[in-house]
């Protein structure tokens, strides 16, 4: 019962916000964006702009110590403590939208070319229950899903939390085996996909180090 109540309380506002951002709609061929903006600056959807709140992460720095919730186990996960493997962080506003769904399918399907030693992780502010449902329906349960649903602490600690919506900005972050951030792309126009192929190539290079 508690799970159902939590799902309803959080799920409906998140869907309405995502729809307002223009991510949802019929599936179509998605454009990939090669450009990036810095965490802590701003992103856009058409003429609308969204300031990125919080403390920006940077290349060569470690991830902040923040607890996320694993969708499958409901256990807390602190990615700053996860060393020994390359982390491929695919960060999306909401899995209940077409662009975010496409990004996650790309991670799960095209990402098979990347070594299994690279941990492919999707992070969003969807509830863990919504993430788990998506994973099962999309047949992408081999990915790890981490939820920032409580307070948006991960978004604020990385400079990736969009104002007005309080959703995470569409981005990819790669962390090397020592826990250092080595790659960041924050998509300037959130209706476009990140350059997943470039990120895959970089992840493979980091895995060989």
Where in the sequence are the language-model features?
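N-terminal targeting signals for export/organelle localization
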Residues: 2-69
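Residue-level signal for well-ordered, solvent-exposed loop/turn and beta-edge residues enriched
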Residues: 74-75, 180
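Structural microenvironment flanking redox-active thiols in thiol-disulfide oxidoreductases
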Residues: 101-140, 145, 152-154
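Short, small/polar residue-rich loop motifs at catalytic or cofactor-binding pockets
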Residues: 62, 86, 167-169
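Short active-site neighborhood of thiol/selenol oxidoreductases, capturing the structured segment around
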Residues: 77-107
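Thiol-/selenol-based redox modules, centered on thioredoxin-like
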Residues: 168-209
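Hydrophobic alpha-helical segments, especially N-terminal targeting/anchoring helices
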Residues: 69-70, 175
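Structural micro-motif
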Residues: 143, 162-173
